[in-house]
């Protein structure tokens, strides 16, 4: 098992980042790949969780140990796999998540992709009271120069599809942001807030 990796961030895609260390490039699935944009070709530390399957060894990465802790709690719930947990972490509203779990807000929990009523109820059953305090929001929120356009929106939509959101939902998101100019990371954060509002 791995705790973290320290190396050079060499690539960003809609689903994952690549960190090179000792001549090897590690594919790491992350909640919002574009939150790492400022770190391309720089030394980064990514906290890791490894999932071993018959057909693949997968790495899931996080900005902070708090973000990783939320992910680990989520995958301990029956019905929540790593991809779904990553989509929940991507919303970057841990306070809202913890409040929903502690207050049995099933409707809020069902707004996450691939979370039905049964799984939402299981989340409450398994995780209520398990978060001593809501961790700080975990994404990289550094302001950046505004160099976005439709390409940035396209990348954001692609990343949201990878998180499990439906194309029909994302058509509305695209229409909402058409004509605006943001980074892919900012589009993703704003879109996730809109999707959670329903």
Curated annotation (Swiss-Prot):
Ranges where the record places region Flexible linker: 143-147
GO biological process annotation, one example: DNA recombination
GO MF term (any one): four-way junction DNA binding
Gene3D superfamilies, per the entry: 5' to 3' exonuclease, C-terminal subdomain (1.10.150.20), DNA helicase RuvA subunit, C-terminal domain (1.10.8.10), Nucleic acid-binding proteins (2.40.50.140)
Cell compartment(s), UniProt: Cytoplasm
SMART domains in alphabetical order: HhH1
Chief location bin: cytoplasm
CDD domains: UBA_RuvA_C
KW Ribosomal protein (keyword) present: no
Family of the protein in this entry: Belongs to the RuvA family.
Full protein name: Holliday junction branch migration complex subunit RuvA
Gene encoding the protein: ruvA
